[in-house]
């Protein structure tokens, strides 16, 4: 849903019942540098054009099962997830010259949703065989797993890893349900390359 007044434009996902309309889910559309776009012509060209409008609705909304609310990504979340997915698609993994990257989000800015949407786009595109949410604290992995499962669609599985052996089995698995994995640095660090997992395992997964 998009609302336009002479002074500003707001967009939000339709929450259904009147009591579910909440101002915290009303967003301004901003450009890549987080500058609010107020000119209606820019709104039309940047947000309401085809295929952008279709992409925002089809790929950048999340039906959060935890609070039963349809949510749409804020503009900076959209740019982050879109950029990550695009770079992953363009990367030639056979050259082994790819680099890491990071997304800078502040507290309360929707990091979990951004990371989930990025992983979902990559997994659904087939550009990566595995997407691993690697977290630095075990308690954080439990919290994130709960949130990711709330974001996931009915046909998507978010895999937990209670121990290193289960993590190893998920990494080696060729099952499509094992593409999205949540685990901790501690469990990942227990896996020894060449001993627990071989290049053949990696090639098969």
Regions found by a protein language model. Give the residues of each.
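Conserved P-loop NTPase catalytic core
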Residues: 203-205
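Conserved helicase motor
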Residues: 138, 160-170, 184-190
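Conserved motor-coupling elements within RecA-like helicase/translocase cores
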Residues: 164-181, 197-200
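Conserved ATPase-coupling elements of RecA-like P-loop NTPase cores
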Residues: 191-195
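Conserved residues at beta->alpha junctions
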Residues: 135
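ATP-dependent helicase/translocase motor core
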Residues: 1-130, 139, 143-155, 180, ...
């Amino acid at each position: 849903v998009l609302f336009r007044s002479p002074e500003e434009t707001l967009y939000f996902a339709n929450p259904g019942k009147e009591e579910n309309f909440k101002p915290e889910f009303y967003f301004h559309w901003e450009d890549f540098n987080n500058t609010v776009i107020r000119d209606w012509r820019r709104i039309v060209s940047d947000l309401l054009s085809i295929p952008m409008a279709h992409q925002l609705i089809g790929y950048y909304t999340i039906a959060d099962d935890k609070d039963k609310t349809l949510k749409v990504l804020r503009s900076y979340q959209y740019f982050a997830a879109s950029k990550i997915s695009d770079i992953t698609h363009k990367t030639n993994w056979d050259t082994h010259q790819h680099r890491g990257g990071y997304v800078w989000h502040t507290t309360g800015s929707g990091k979990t949703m951004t990371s989930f949407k990025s992983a979902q786009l990559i997994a659904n595109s087939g550009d990566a065989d595995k997407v691993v949410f690697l977290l630095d604290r075990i308690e954080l992995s439990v919290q994130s797993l709960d949130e990711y499962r709330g974001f996931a669609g009915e046909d998507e599985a978010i895999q937990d890893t209670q121990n290193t052996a289960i993590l190893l089995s998920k990494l080696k698995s060729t099952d499509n349900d094992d593409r999205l994995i949540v685990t901790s640095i501690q469990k990942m660090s227990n896996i020894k390359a060449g001993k627990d997992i071989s290049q053949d395992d990696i090639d098969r997964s």
